[in-house]
Amino acid sequence: MKKVFIFLLFPFTLAAQQADILIKNGKILDGTGNSWYYGDIAIQNGKIVGIGRSIKFTATKTIDATGLIVAPGFNDVHTHIEGEEKRQPTADNFIYDGVTSVVTGNCGGSQVNMANYFSMLDSLHLSINVASLIGHNDVRKTAMGSANRDPTEEEMKKMEAIVEQAMKDGAVGLSTGLIYIPGTYSKTEEVVRLAKVASAYHGVYASHMRDEGDSVTQDIEEAMHIGRESKMPVEISHFKLSGQQNWGRSKITVPMIIKAREEGFDVTIDQYPYTASSTSLSTLLPDWVLADGQDSIKARLAKPEIRKQVIKC
């Protein structure tokens, strides 16, 4: 006699899990490069605990995202927030634009003591995440003031020590502002030596180049040379062409970046989406005015005949 087994199948549903926040019906862009899709996102204790089309959650707060895009927070890699942290710890200007993480210390300007800087940030309970580069200009000022000369070996070692300590304390790389005083007085090899220190701690090299106008191609090459010599990724800041005489040269500069990347070199660029810029007055002065440091600059500009020549330039 054969035994017959009868299985009774009963329909059942899984109980919905509890979350603090449930974002429903949004177009989800997850940041991986995949196409968007409709779905829900469940958040518990500040962390995503469910994401997808058919997740089962109830929540204390439900947000209807119909017709809206839901995405991870954006990273702004060029911000110059130094000095604003205490005035606006809520960082509304970033949050309202969907930016949740920023990089500061760009263009060679940063706090030199990173341990103190990060401790200050922690005490403010900022609403955004902050990473900082260590700025070459401030490192150089600390070691040798605004002198228009090469550093002595002792000064060079002091700069290297400052960069190393900054990287140990959490800096994410080295930035330069080679158009600004005193960075404009430095030679390429000086920057290479400091970049090698940051590279040992897996940092990135971010460059505000010496010039973004007539000599832009050679300055792009300098930025990439520094990266290659130090074996670190390069980020070229606010990639652009200054001066009407240079309009259209992006047909040359953009392929330079593409070619380097195709060859396996890690170089990236950032760009602001408008046709204005903000910088210091010194960048508009000719090299012969900037020679020999700030005291000499002030003395020259105090002379009426010099000011007339500068206006003509």
What residue ranges belong to the model's regions?
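Cationic-aromatic interfacial patches
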Residues: M224, M232-I236
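Histidine-rich, glycine-flanked metal-binding segment
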Residues: A19-I21, I28-G73
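Acidic-and-aromatic substrate-binding clefts and catalytic sites of carbohydrate-active enzymes
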Residues: H80-K86, S110-Q111, G183-S186, D211-T217, ...
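Polyanionic/metal-chelating signatures
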Residues: Y117-L121, D138-P151, L178, R228-S230, ...
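Divalent-metal coordination cores built from histidine and acidic residues
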Residues: A65-V70, F74-I81, K86-T176, A195-H202, ...
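Active-site beta-loop-alpha junctions enriched in small/polar residues
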Residues: H80, C107, G135-N137, G177-I181, ...
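Divalent metal-binding pocket/active-site signature
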Residues: Q165, A171-A223
